[in-house]
């Protein structure tokens, strides 16, 4: 897990948000998402090269990108759920992540990728998830 200085600046050094981000990344580690994506990309790449005949062609890379993007969004949702759970277990509100994703959305502005090729769920979806997780934690 790598934490950049840009991330720390973005959240103004807020330790609770940093804890939420680290909990999210820990979710990826626990679910072995990196290894799964590597295996999936390799398998889809081989299949695409067999079907298309030339892996170097742009056409052969399309299934790899689309397949990985869809899997990646699911992996991000699982990691978000892990983050919310770990925050609750530590006595912190998952709501700390709402402000984080609002800042991310503001930073990205007009430079967003279409959902078909985006590797992460839409910021609005993630904000809604963490708001709901915070509301459930208060019950």
State the predicted function of each range.
Residues 1-139:
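A Zn2+-metalloprotease active-site environment signal
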């Amino acid at each position: 897990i790598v934490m950049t200085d840009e991330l720390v600046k973005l959240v103004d050094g807020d330790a609770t948000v940093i804890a939420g981000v680290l909990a999210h990344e820990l979710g990826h580690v626990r679910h072995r998402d990196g290894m799964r994506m590597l295996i999936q990309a390799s398998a889809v790449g081989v299949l695409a090269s067999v079907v298309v005949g030339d892996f170097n062609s742009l056409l052969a890379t399309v299934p790899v990108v689309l397949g990985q993007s869809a899997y990646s969004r699911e992996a991000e949702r699982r990691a978000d759920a892990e983050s919310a759970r770990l925050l609750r277990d530590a006595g912190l509100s998952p709501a700390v992540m709402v402000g984080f994703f609002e800042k991310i959305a503001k930073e990205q502005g007009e430079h967003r990728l279409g959902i078909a090729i985006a590797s992460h769920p839409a910021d609005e979806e993630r904000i809604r998830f963490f708001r709901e997780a915070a509301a459930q934690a208060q019950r």
